[in-house]
Regions:
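Glycine-rich phosphate-binding loop
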Residues: 49-63, 178-200, 205, 249-289
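Gly/Ser/Thr-enriched, mixed-charge loops and adjacent short helices
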Residues: 64-179
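Gly/Ser/Thr-rich active-site loops/lids in small-molecule metabolic enzymes
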Residues: 76, 151, 204-223, 287-299
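Cysteine-centered motifs
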Residues: 418-419
Length: 425
């Protein structure tokens, strides 16, 4: 199966892949321009275990890439490197067949059939000029209510804003609309529809780990022995709350492919990432689907008298940064992280927990911070959460903490990669 998103280079890449596969005897099913979650659905619906989805996801518009499924398992990392060892002599010269399949219609029908009477809310949807447009049009025609769509046309230039809904500057338009029109909810998607950004009734972006917490607690009502997974960037409030409610919660490395492997090994019911990937395995297929997750959230709000702001405020007991990306040369970012992991204990005495499953996450009684190398961009990701009752400027707090400042400024990252936090300069 081959599908593609709406980026400017995606169609050309798809056509070249199809031509190459067919020339070597591989039959291809073309599912055309489609969101990534629907391409995953195609492997289930068509009972074909192999998929290439051409997408740059939330990355800058000049980026592109391949999301690969082989034998119903994510194909990444060392598996990709192993392709160099294949013997070309074993390839067929018989021309493979090409067929075209519509999976948008069965996907949409199946999704809609699981939800009823989602008509109480006023919702604004920001499609970000991404590949998700055909799906959302069909869904809102079925769920009724008041629905407004922003940036509905598919355009790989992303003329209105960059397609990453977890970054505040990218959700200014939808935020203003919520405030001006008094809407209940804002839902924004990335370029290929597998990551979600949620805004509450006040137009405020709610971090995806808190949204995942709400969704997990809702699922707990139905599945009492819930097993959940959250990535290393997520709030400690999420982990503590789920654990205190009897959930078997596991911390994972960041990355949708890595989380899918862990879902399988732990037989998890639900999983989520700070970046907005949310995976439902209980009564669903186990892949990250922002469309399905958005309908689950709408269902929660549709069955309560509370606003989203009221539902989430009880968990907003900390001050935290978003993901802060520190530029780092691609060739050295992982080795530099190894050096940081080695150096950090020198700056802290007892009373700290070091979690090194993905970079380093240092936890104390009052705060935690994370430094990890991005899997998809030439940067190192930093996030900090501090538990205080009074709000303050987190940037200044970090700057006043000599230990954190030393870790950042005196590390090999700062010396060799010109990484810095703007508020520490």
């Amino acid at each position: 199966i081959i599908g593609h998103d709406g980026r400017l280079s995606s169609l050309e890449i798809k056509n070249k892949l199809i031509d190459t596969f067919r020339r070597h005897g591989v039959d291809v099913v073309d599912i055309s321009l489609i969101p990534t979650p629907v391409s995953y659905y195609a492997t289930k619906k068509l009972d074909i275990p192999n998929l290439i989805m051409i997408t740059g996801s939330h990355n800058p518009k000049e980026y592109n890439g391949l999301k690969i499924i082989i034998d119903n398992k994510p194909f990444f990392g060392e598996k990709i490197k192993s392709l160099n060892d294949l013997d070309d002599a074993s390839l067929s010269t018989t021309l493979g067949q090409l067929t075209f399949k519509d999976v948008i219609t069965p996907y949409t029908d199946e999704i809609i059939s699981q939800f009823n009477n989602l008509d109480k809310l006023k919702i604004v949807w920001d499609l970000g000029n991404g590949a998700i447009a055909p799906i959302i049009h069909k869904i809102i025609n079925s769920i009724k209510g008041t629905n407004i769509i922003l940036n509905r046309s598919i355009d790989g230039n992303f003329p209105n804003h960059h397609p990453d809904p977890t970054i505040k500057k990218n959700i200014t338009q939808i935020s203003n609309y919520i405030k001006e029109k008094k809407f209940d909810l804002g839902i924004a998607f990335d370029g290929d529809g597998d990551r979600i950004g949620i805004l509450d009734n006040k137009g405020e972006l709610i971090y995806s780990d808190i949204i995942f917490l709400l969704l997990s607690l809702d699922l707990l009502k139905e599945k009492k022995d819930l097993v959940a997974i959250a990535d290393v960037k997520c709030s400690k409030i999420l982990f503590d709350t789920l654990k205190n409610n009897g959930v078997d919660i596991h911390m994972s490395k960041t990355g949708h492919s890595l989380i899918k492997e862990m879902i399988s090994s732990k037989n998890a019911d639900i999983a989520g990432e700070m970046s907005g990937h949310i995976f439902y395995n209980y009564k669903y297929y186990g892949y990250d689907d922002a469309i399905y997750a958005s309908l689950k959230l709408i269902n929660i709000l549709n069955n309560t008298k509370k606003t989203l702001n009221e539902l989430t405020s009880v968990y907003m007991k900390s001050s935290s940064t978003p993901e802060i990306k520190l530029y780092c040369d691609e060739k050295i970012k992982f080795s530099l992280l190894d050096k940081i992991v080695e150096d950090i204990p020198k700056h802290y005495d007892s009373g700290v927990d070091l979690i090194t499953i993905d970079g380093v996450r240092l936890e104390t009684e009052n705060f935690w911070f994370l430094l990890r190398a991005s899997n998809t961009q030439n940067c190192i990701v930093f996030r900090l959460e501090h538990f205080v009752k009074d709000k303050f400027k987190l940037e200044k707090k970090i700057g006043r903490d000599p230990k954190i400042a030393t870790v950042i400024h005196e590390s090999e990252v700062s010396k060799k990669a010109c990484c810095r936090l703007s508020f520490l300069s």
